[in-house]
């Protein structure tokens, strides 16, 4: 990565943070490790209880619900809503697909 590319990425991140602060948009503009773990765990439980996988099991190469859930998350196929609590006590609801799309633009 060149210096100019790095500076461009930093500027994009600064713009996202500024929007989040000024417009109360969601921040951080990515899934946290705790949200990722919660989503994978919840989806793996659904799969273990008999829900239909959203990916072809042959492509994943395993019937393990955790691996299937990880692949579904990686492909952006899950339709979850993330609830984030703000320090002022308000809650923010964010669609997982929107958050993944924003994360990919950074």
UniProtKB/Swiss-Prot annotation:
Reaction catalysed by this enzyme: RNA(n) + a ribonucleoside 5'-triphosphate = RNA(n+1) + diphosphate
GO molecular function: DNA binding; DNA-directed RNA polymerase activity
EC number: 2.7.7.6
PROSITE patterns reported for this sequence: RNA_POL_K_14KD
InterPro entries: DNA-dir_RNA_polK_14-18kDa_CS, Pol_omega/Rpo6/RPB6, RPB6/omega-like_sf, Rpo6/Rpb6
One of the protein's GO biological processes: transcription by RNA polymerase II
Keywords assigned by UniProt, alphabetized: Cytoplasm, DNA-directed RNA polymerase, Nucleotidyltransferase, Transcription, Transferase
Residue ranges crossing the lipid bilayer per the database entry: none
Classification via SMART domains: RNA_pol_Rpb6
This protein's GO CC annotations: cytoplasm; DNA-directed RNA polymerase complex
Localization: Cytoplasm
Predominant location category: cytoplasm
The UniProt record lists the keyword Iron: no
Entry's family note: Belongs to the archaeal Rpo6/eukaryotic RPB6 RNA polymerase subunit family.
Assembly and oligomerization: Part of the RNA polymerase complex.
NCBIfam families the record matches: PRK01099.1-2, PRK01099.1-3
Stated role: DNA-dependent RNA polymerase (RNAP) catalyzes the transcription of DNA into RNA using the four ribonucleoside triphosphates as substrates.
Protein name, UniProt field: DNA-directed RNA polymerase subunit Rpo6
Organism: Pyrobaculum aerophilum (strain ATCC 51768 / DSM 7523 / JCM 9630 / CIP 104966 / NBRC 100827 / IM2)
Gene: rpo6
